[in-house]
Regions:
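N-terminal Lys/Arg-rich, disordered targeting/topogenic segments
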Residues: 1-14, 20
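Hydrophobic membrane-insertion alpha-helices, especially the h-region
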Residues: 15-31
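Hydrophobic single-pass membrane-insertion segments
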Residues: 30-39
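Catalytic-core regions of hydrolytic enzymes
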Residues: 39-52, 58-166
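Conserved hydrophobic/aromatic pocket- or pore-lining residues that grip, position, or stack substrates
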Residues: 54, 77, 171, 206, ...
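Short, charged, low-complexity patches
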Residues: 77, 164, 168, 222, ...
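Active-site-adjacent substrate-binding region
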Residues: 162-189
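Active-site-adjacent mobile loop/cap segments within catalytic or ligand-binding domains
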Residues: 183-246
Length: 246
């Protein structure tokens, strides 16, 4: 009888301990989500279940622009893109990448640099137009060799496409508010860019900053600055879909 009562009492203690442990875990999760303003509730965001293509500009052997300290555009493009991907997937979006590592996506039959670039861009367009995606965001960096004074991001949208303009406006606005409200640039229409011209969905290029500006180049190499850019772009995407569906 004594052993039975001891075992029963011990079992009750174990159950209570488990309940307390689960309760404490829930409290910690709630506290973490409260403290971390970049945590996302999947069922509360407009882009949930949307298909979004993220295009990381360039890719080896095409480095894109080169900035101070031999900073490679293609490398930073990819880092920002992967951070946006993480935020979107946490929010329930389906994310497709045109490239997921440092390499371009040219055909193996392409031999010269020129052939690889042409093959790469055509393959990107094919991914976009066969994906049934809702939007395309192409991530790039700017460079102006004649002057180092220019800095800041700017969005560019597909000409004669109202949805592209709305998307570019939402992203530009949220970047300005969440990264640097001194940036007063507005979205610009763009033409003669093959990827944007040939895409059959709302398409935007985000030039995330100038590698020709030393201070901005240093910032663009920093993980936390890339996180801020990704967060601003993420919020812009949410803003676009919220207005589209309202």
């Amino acid at each position: 009888m004594g052993d039975y009562m001891f075992k029963k009492s011990h079992l009750k203690y174990v159950k209570i301990s488990i309940i307390i442990f689960i309760f404490l875990c829930l409290i910690l999760v709630i506290y973490y989500n409260y403290k971390n303003n970049k945590s996302v509730k999947t069922n509360a965001v407009p882009a949930s279940n949307k298909i979004i293509i993220l295009d990381s500009g360039h890719g080896l052997p095409d480095n894109g622009a080169t900035g101070f300290y031999m900073t490679s555009e293609q490398e930073i493009n990819l880092k920002i893109t992967l951070k946006i991907q993480k935020l979107l997937e946490q929010s329930g979006s389906v994310v497709l990448l045109t490239r997921s590592d440092e390499n371009g996506i040219y055909d193996i039959s392409a031999d010269t640099i020129r052939e690889k670039k042409i093959s790469d861009i055509k393959n990107r367009v094919n991914i976009i137009n066969t994906s049934k995606a809702d939007i395309l965001i192409s991530i790039h960096l700017n460079k102006y060799a004649a002057s180092s004074v220019y800095s800041g991001w700017q969005t560019f949208y597909k000409e004669n496409n109202d949805e592209s303009k709305k998307l570019a406006t939402a992203i530009q606005s949220n970047l300005n508010k969440n990264v640097d409200n001194n940036n007063d640039r507005i979205p610009m229409k763009i033409k003669d860019v093959y990827l944007i011209e040939k895409s059959n969905i709302p398409s935007v290029i985000v030039e995330c900053g100038f590698l020709s500006n030393k201070e901005e180049c240093e910032n663009l190499k920093k993980d936390d600055y890339q996180e801020n850019l990704a967060w601003g772009i993420f919020l812009g995407i949410q803003d676009y879909f919220e207005k589209k569906e309202s």
